[in-house]
C-alpha cells in the first residue's frame, strides 16, 4: 500500500514507525531534501535495518526490459558493511516512479545486462570475492544463481573486482572488464572475461579469461607518484574493430593528479 504524509520539510530528520497487531514494531529513519531527477531508492545513513552496517547505495545499473519496463540495480556498502547485497527496482512509467522488485545475495559491484532477450546480473560475491552471474526469467522478480565464473587465484593476493561498466560485443564474443587485486594488496591488474556471442552466459565452461596485466608506471604518459593505479574498466568495441578497455585512472596525490 502507498501512504501520503503531508507537511514534511526538507533537511529535517524523521522516524517512521510501523506497528503490527502482534505488537512487533519497526522504526526506519529518513529525511527529505532536493535531488535532481527521480529518486529510485533511498537509504538513510543511520538505517541498518536490513543490511548489517552497510548504509550507502552504489554500483548503479539500468536496463530496459523486453516488456518495456525499466529495471535499476544497486548494491549496499559502507566501510564496515557486509558488502554482499544488491537490490532491484522497477519502473513502468519511463522512470517517473519506482517500486521495489527483488533482492539478491551474495552480489556486489554488479551490472545488469540483456543477452538475446535474457536478463542477467554479473557481479562478485562480495568485496574481492569470486565473480558470479545470476539470471532472471521473470523480469527481475526472482533470480537463479549464483553461478561461479572466476574464483580467487591460489597464491595471488586480492581477488576479482569489477564495476558496473558496459559489456561489448567484438569478434563474435561478449566481453566484460574485470580486474584482480585489491587496494590493500597494492592495486589492481586489468583483464577481461568473455563468452561466445551465441553462447549461454550461465554456463561457466563457455567463459574465458584473458589473464591480468599489472599497472606499469614506466608506460608513456603516466602520472608520477606513489598512488597511481587503474581499475573499474569499461569494454568498448571501437569502430576500427579493436576492443578497448577504458579504465578509471587513480592518480590522486600524483603529478599530474588529474586528466
For each predicted feature, which ranges?
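Beta-rich carbohydrate-recognition and catalytic domains
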Residues: 6-8, 12, 17-108, 113-163, ...
Amino acid at each position: 500500500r502507498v501512504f501520503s504524509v503531508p507537511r514534511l520539510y526538507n533537511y529535517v530528520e524523521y522516524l517512521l514507525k510501523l506497528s503490527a497487531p502482534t505488537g512487533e514494531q519497526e522504526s526506519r529513519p529518513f529525511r527529505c531534501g532536493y535531488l535532481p531527477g527521480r529518486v529510485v531508492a533511498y537509504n538513510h545513513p543511520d538505517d541498518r535495518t536490513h543490511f548489517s552496517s552497510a548504509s550507502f547505495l552504489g554500483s548503479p545499473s539500468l536496463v530496459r526490459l523486453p516488456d518495456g519496463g525499466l529495471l535499476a540495480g544497486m548494491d549496499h556498502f559502507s566501510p564496515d558493511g557486509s558488502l554482499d547485497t544488491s537490490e532491484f527496482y522497477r519502473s513502468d512509467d519511463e522512470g517517473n516512479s519506482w517500486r521495489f522488485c527483488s533482492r539478491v545475495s551474495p552480489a556486489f559491484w554488479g551490472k545488469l545486462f540483456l543477452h538475446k532477450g535474457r536478463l542477467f546480473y554479473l557481479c562478485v560475491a562480495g568485496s574481492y570475492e569470486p565473480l558470479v552471474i545470476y539470471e532472471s526469467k521473470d523480469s527481475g522478480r526472482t533470480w537463479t544463481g549464483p553461478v561461479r565464473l572466476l574464483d580467487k587465484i591460489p597464491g595471488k593476493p586480492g581477488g576479482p573486482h569489477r564495476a558496473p561498466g558496459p559489456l561489448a560485443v567484438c569478434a563474435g564474443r561478449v566481453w566484460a572488464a574485470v580486474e584482480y587485486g585489491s587496494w590493500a594488496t597494492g592495486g589492481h591488474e586489468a583483464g577481461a572475461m568473455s563468452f561466445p556471442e551465441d553462447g549461454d552466459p550461465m554456463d561457466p565452461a563457455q567463459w574465458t579469461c584473458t589473464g591480468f596485466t599489472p599497472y606499469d608506471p614506466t608506460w608513456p604518459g603516466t602520472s608520477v607518484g606513489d598512488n597511481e593505479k587503474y581499475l573499474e574498466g569499461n569494454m568498448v568495441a571501437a569502430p576500427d574493430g579493436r576492443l578497448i578497455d577504458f579504465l578509471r585512472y587513480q592518480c590522486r596525490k600524483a603529478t599530474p593528479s588529474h586528466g
